[in-house]
Amino acid sequence: GIDGMVVIGGDGSFRGAQKLADAGVNTIGLPGTIDLDIACTDYTIGFDTAVNTAMEAIDRLRETSNSHERCSVVEVMGRSAGYIALWCGIANGAEQILIPEKFDNNYDKLIEEIKNNRASGMTHQIIVNAEGIGHSYGLAKKIEEATGIETRATILGHLQRGGSPTARDRVYASVMGAYAIDCI
């Protein structure tokens, strides 16, 4: 028989875990989602790896944006949470970071900032766009039409779910896993 169940995941996994617990199965849930959007937790397994994977991709995009003097709109995952975009944007020194929690859909203001940056001598720009805002290809087209600056969109997508786990994710997963076994 089954003595207990350790469920690693996000909201959907936890809903399933709750059904098991309601049926009398000794169940514990560990927060595991790149989105960092689980209530009542400060950290989720996978978030750090996703941020680092996206950060490395954005570093490479900055190089080509710089050499071609273009604007790059980079869409990162996160569903309706902007944590990946925020962390990547700060870590990569993005000129703009668009997250669902704060962006008011004022594209005119965004375009004005891009124009001002170009006028002040900035030759390239990175805009990190959260998945919850989306429409990166349309945004890139809108920016290029309004500014005349060559603008490309890159959607990192499931690339962020791959790669080797960071040391932080490995340690947190190990500690949480050991604690979960003790709790069962």
Predicted regions and their residues:
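Short gly/pro/ser/thr-enriched loop/turn and capping motifs at secondary-structure boundaries
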Residues: 14, 33-38, 104-106, 158-161
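C-terminal binding/interaction regions
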Residues: 2
